[in-house]
Amino acid sequence: MSLHSTFKKISPTTLLKQEDWEGLCLYFSQHPEKVRDSAGNEQNIILFAIACLRKDETDVGLTLLSDRVLTAKNGRDLLRRWVISPLASSQPDAVLQVVNKLLAVNVCQPEDVLLVASVLLKSKQYATVADLAEQAWLAFSGNSQIFALHLRTLVLMDKELQAISLARTQAQEVPPRGDMIATCLSFLNKSRLPEDHDLARALLPFFALERQESAGLAVDTLCAVGKYQEAIQTGESALARGLDGAALRRSLGLAYYQSGRSREAKLQAAEHWRHALQFNSDNVRIVTLYADALIRTGQNEKAIPLLQQSLATHPDLPYVRAMYARALRQVGQYTAASDEFVQLAREKGVTSKWNRYAAAALLQAGKTSEAESVFEHYIQARASHLPQSFEEGLLALDGQISAVNLPPERLDWAWEVAGRQSGIERDEWERRAKWGYLADNFLLDWLECRGEQADEPMYRLADISHVEQFFQRLQLDQRGCIIVSAHLGAMYAGPMILSLLEMNSKWVASTPGVLKGGYGERLISVSDKSEADVVRACMQTLHSGQSLVVAIDGALNLSAPTIDFFGQQITYSTFCSRLAWKMHLPTVFSVPIWKNRHIHFVLERMVDPLKFESQLSFTERWKENYLQCVTRILQSDPENLRLSGGIWRNIIRRDS
């Protein structure tokens, strides 16, 4: 029997079912009248187009798919069965063109779009998927899955605000569409606008918490409006009802973590993230949350293998590498830590803060020459961006205020503690506070990077004759004293003032011990020494008759102890008060402050131990004295808030 006679007897439908694409093409080549562009041939033309597309003859196949052919009976169904489904993974570009043609004539179905979009997303063709999703949303404006896809692709195209705006519009529909709520919540929670968070919360009564993902989303929504305890109750209630999974555990851990910075809250958060990892061990977000909580509760040994695993699969994530380096340093693996910090410094550039960490880590690893080289390059790079004079730079700070981006909870807390009673309008108060933040950081840059011009900031000093008189009245003789400070005011002016007064003192700071010049010679660096080494250096300083300067609200260790202060947990060390009690030394609270953009020096003699007073009693009384001093600085001019480091590190949004 000849091949020609065989094809006469086999129908195109049979060849289609046999997936005999060569046979189909041959059949229609022998019967050209069946695929002529005329009424009644639409079904055959569809089959011919399918055969061409399956043979990878894309241009021919697409040409055959005219609007009339596409809208013929069963046209879309045949294309879905024989082209879209089987070719989406292997020939996504061809399938995309078919889907776009179907969309253009309004016969496409949402599942066609979702299938090809999922494939294109895996290959990171975000712009292509975004265009497809936008067209699909016009065609299927009521479809919840297309809505979610459209918003997701907008975010991938850096159009998050547009995505949030669409979510906002949809969320305002009355009554709310139940199948749209999850997507609306996800995007409204990302918004920076409090009214969007309130809108999201208003949707919760209509949101069915039937799955652990939905419960997790409800927890996130409550956290976004500061209802942490309600969020915790919602999450724990879902667990009690048998809902459990990575999403819920992740969100519940965040609720505990955001509810307070106490060790107990961090431990509870860590426990939920540990469970989340059991459901999804490859989720980098959960791994890093868990590792961060472990580090902040002093469990560095447990965090290290988790972070190692994450870096092995995601070596391009700097925040993971930073946590890994910190954990290594805390357990004494200084060489390994220095390697990680050096890599961070290289990746982030010569002016990044990681060069400071790298220099300190190299010193701890015994690599002094490398540390000096890294820090010197860091100094030179920063110096190249500084103005010609200190005055020029200080005057330019007003123009930089609008670019300052600080955690809003710090400003909110400071406003409640100090700003509201100041009589200054909130906007002006914030502007002045941000100027103080810029000014102290500029002062640090200048003193570190322009050693030959280190005298220039001194022209901004007010009369400091009272400082010398104050210390003379202490009648120290051959003894030193303990000068305590906080991350407030013009903090970095402190060493400069004491140097100007030729006071025999050393200062404890996180600056690496490779800093050159007079300030460097008086430095006890906490960043390149163990805690035991720092304690020994401080004791030796005081025993030698020198004074010691310490900002006791600072700590490199993320698990450093905290105390309650105006409803927040702030870092606080009892080291100085215990030393004062043990060595019978006077203590002084001291902070350089800004007043009319000049630097003044606040000094206050702190309480001494009473006769036969126990250490516990004294340290408690001394702590209250210290916090009173800190409060007075906070409630002075807003320029003196400083807003970073020390007491500011753990400030969180309070449960509303």
Curated annotation (Swiss-Prot):
Keyword Glycosyltransferase part of the UniProt annotation: no
UniProt cross-references to Pfam families, sorted A to Z: TPR_19
Gene Ontology biological process terms, A to Z: polysaccharide transport
Annotated SUPFAM superfamilies: TPR-like
Keyword tags: Polysaccharide transport, Sugar transport, Transport
Superkingdom of origin: Bacteria
InterPro entries in alphabetical order: TPR-like_helical_dom_sf
Known role: May be involved in translocation of the Vi antigen.
Name of protein: Vi polysaccharide export protein VexE
